[in-house]
Curated annotation (Swiss-Prot):
Binds to the 23S rRNA. InterPro entries: Ribosomal_bL9, Ribosomal_bL9/RNase_H1_N, Ribosomal_bL9_bac/chp, Ribosomal_bL9_C, Ribosomal_bL9_C_sf, Ribosomal_bL9_N, Ribosomal_bL9_N_sf. PANTHER family: 50S RIBOSOMAL PROTEIN L9. Keywords: Ribonucleoprotein, Ribosomal protein, RNA-binding, rRNA-binding. Residues 172-192 are annotated as: Disordered. PROSITE patterns: RIBOSOMAL_L9 (PS00651). Pfam families: Ribosomal_L9_C (PF03948), Ribosomal_L9_N (PF01281). Gene3D superfamilies: Ribosomal protein L9, C-terminal domain, Ribosomal protein L9, N-terminal domain. Belongs to the bacterial ribosomal protein bL9 family. One of its GO terms (cellular component) is ribosome. This is Large ribosomal subunit protein bL9. It comes from Rhizobium johnstonii (strain DSM 114642 / LMG 32736 / 3841) (Rhizobium leguminosarum bv. viciae).
Amino acid sequence: MQVILLERISKLGQMGETVKVRDGFARNYLLPLGKALRANAANKTRFEAERATLEARNLERKSEAQTVADVLDGKSFIVVRSAGETGQLYGSVAARDVVDILGAEGFNIGRNQVHLNTPIKSIGLHKVELQLHAEVEIHVELNVARSAEEAERQSKGEELTSVDAIYGVDEDALRPEDFFDPEADGVDEDEA
């Protein structure tokens, strides 16, 4: 199906371009959300008549997204979740959790604007991509930890899944020669 794009759509085209897409993509996504029009003579003349207002509205949405992006870009947010000793989360941090975290900080972001390939399932520092507008893309950092203190240590670069971090054990004190002393048994090497 041929459609006229009413806004820039990544991996598809710019506003005003006529592109060929699959029928289902057009019927179920582009047309209902107002992102495209069917490419026929009537819609082409309608688009040309409304082009200036569409461009102005698109520019306004882009500037709003850019102001939010200037505040959000590169920010770090702490996410406290329960996790096992190895750093594996008992649950996960998904796109809706990211939306809730940003909403608690006063940012109104939609779930479809959060791009997570897979949910976050381990503690650590994770980069999350936010696409606020078709032309405005930023990254925020999620500091996933078991507690606020661990998040602070993690932000300083400390590894929290090592043996030392988990058990508070000094690995140098666990040398085998400290545990095995042949003279301690009372058996002399010359007699054996």
